[in-house]
Amino acid sequence: MSKKVALAYSGGLDTSICIPLLKEEYGYDEVITVAVDVGQPKEDVAQAEEKAKKISDKHFTLDVREEFVNDYIFPLIRANGDYEGYVMGTSIARPLIAKKVVEIAEQEGAVALAHGCTGKGNDQLRFEAVFRLTDMDVIAPMREMNLTREWEIEYAKEHGIPVGVTTAKPWSVDENIWSRSIEGGKLEDPGYIPPEEIYKWTTAPEDAPDAQIIEIGFENGVPVSLDGQKMGGVELIEKMNIIAGTHGVGRTDMIEDRVLGLKARENYEHPAATVLLAAHKDLEKLVLTRAELKFKATVDAQWSELAYYGLVDEPLYDDLNAFIDKTQERVAGTVTMKLYKGSVLVLARTSPYALYSEELVSFDGTSIDQKDAEGFAKYHGFQARLYRKFVVKN
């Protein structure tokens, strides 16, 4: 009986050389490649499929864009997903990709699961958090063989595997509908200024056109319309990436704390994510109480950490989502924003659940008798006065 292994396949250098390695070094008879479409460019998906069919024994391409948006990105928006300023496009996609690889492995009778992640990054942990929910063996050639990028490039050439990187320009790109990450090579030097050529989604802010006003509509905490036109999540995010990217919105160059404790220099593009997260957070301020906002900020931070680590099967992750889902019942309305040369500015917001009262807050309003605040003011900071009087004095 053939000894099969299912490989999470992207079409890139790492996963491509895993195919011969799994046979030559690990003794598998059949390598089944699984490419999961979470919004990569169509040409990348097609090229990965074409390459896999030439060098693997069996290949599957799965289009899960709708599932990715509805079950992963929308919960991220509702949770104001953010890890140290990173919108977690790669992080949130990995568990879904891993689950699809497991499904194919079980369908095809594979005895092992493999990925092309290194031993220094986060993705190995995200994939394996899902893979190890099964009883199948888990193989990580890059980590286990301690391979370098230069060695991989030469190995690929020896095996006739085309690669899209060179030793002169060895950065790697990971892309889905929510974000595009660029890392490796000279970019690993935090003192190196990235060349403009690494950016594909965003216009350089100084070259961006004049300002554009847009309106995002929300229901139950998720975006449902753009400029008054209802549309599905995939279409909305794709359009927003183009619009915001044209205005130079959504570039991040950051030092990121990886799960293992290493600090890494990361470059990201995420136009739609920047706009939609800013709009959602602003709308929440209009409809949620101060107590809800304060507590939800803590919940959001914990949610984001679990998502970044790839721990979406943790019971706590479900618990946090239950609370977040309840708060989002009132997060509905519209947010008007201005996009201008790399910046996003909220101009206006409306909601049928707004807790804002223009009459009550106005300096000219008479609904509240200002004298009623006198008693409250007398005892505001009361404990501090007692401390200063009886403790500091002595």
UniProtKB/Swiss-Prot annotation:
The name this protein goes by in its record: Argininosuccinate synthase
Family as reported in the entry's similarity comment: Belongs to the argininosuccinate synthase family. Type 1 subfamily.
Gene: argG
EC number per UniProt: 6.3.4.5
InterPro entries the record matches: Arginosuc_syn_C, Arginosuc_syn_N, Arginosuc_synth, Arginosuc_synth_CS, Arginosuc_synth_type_1_subfam, AS_cat/multimer_dom_body, Rossmann-like_a/b/a_fold
Top enzyme class: ligase
Source superkingdom: Archaea
Binding site for L-aspartate: 118, 122-123
Reactions performed catalytically: L-citrulline + L-aspartate + ATP = 2-(N(omega)-L-arginino)succinate + AMP + diphosphate + H(+)
UniProt: ATP binding residues: 8-16, 116
Single GO MF annotation: ATP binding
SUPFAM superfamilies: Adenine nucleotide alpha hydrolases-like, Argininosuccinate synthetase, C-terminal domain
Species of provenance: Methanococcoides burtonii (strain DSM 6242 / NBRC 107633 / OCM 468 / ACE-M)
Assembly and interaction partners: Homotetramer.
